[in-house]
Design a protein with these regions (language model features):
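Intrinsically disordered, flexible peripheral segments
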Residues: 1-149
């Protein structure tokens, strides 16, 4: 009975639908801030190396970077530490950049799924000490992507 109450409380408290999942629910933990409690960066503004002075970036600063369709992008870790998610477009293609300060991992994903451009946010939840992303239009996600990936 205690386990059932804990699961019900977790489901309703966090506001997510966990009826379909591919990871053990017992391994999901509260990461502190709630859903979108850490604001993502949407449509970021970029500076050239010449525009950025040394107060913004140092040569030894870490970045998460990638090249897509011959376009290179870098996202400073000191910015990602505070926002964790960037929704961006590269060559007209939507991408999401995530960085988990807790485990120090950064990833880049294609945000175009099933003919839709998706926007991601911070869920406030962790799986094995790594952040879980949420799609900001969750009702669309539940309705359109109703199969496990």
């Amino acid at each position: 009975l205690l386990w059932c109450w804990r699961v019900w409380f977790f489901f309703t408290l966090s506001g997510f639908d966990y009826s379909r999942h591919s990871i053990p629910l017992d391994d999901i933990s509260d990461g502190g801030p709630g859903k979108d409690g850490i604001p993502s960066i949407d449509n970021p503004h970029f500076l050239t190396v010449g525009e950025a002075d040394q107060s913004l970036m140092q040569n030894e600063d870490r970045v998460t970077g990638f090249v897509f369709n011959d376009q290179a992008r870098e996202y400073p870790i000191k910015i990602l530490n505070w926002h964790e998610i960037v929704n961006d477009r590269v060559g007209g293609n939507p991408v999401v950049i995530s960085f988990c300060p807790l485990c120090g991992t950064g990833m880049v994903f294609d945000a175009h799924v099933e003919n839709r451009n998706l926007k991601f946010g911070v869920s406030g939840l962790l799986y094995q000490s790594d952040m879980l992303l949420t799609i900001t239009k969750q009702k669309f996600y539940e309705r359109k992507l109703n199969r496990r990936r």
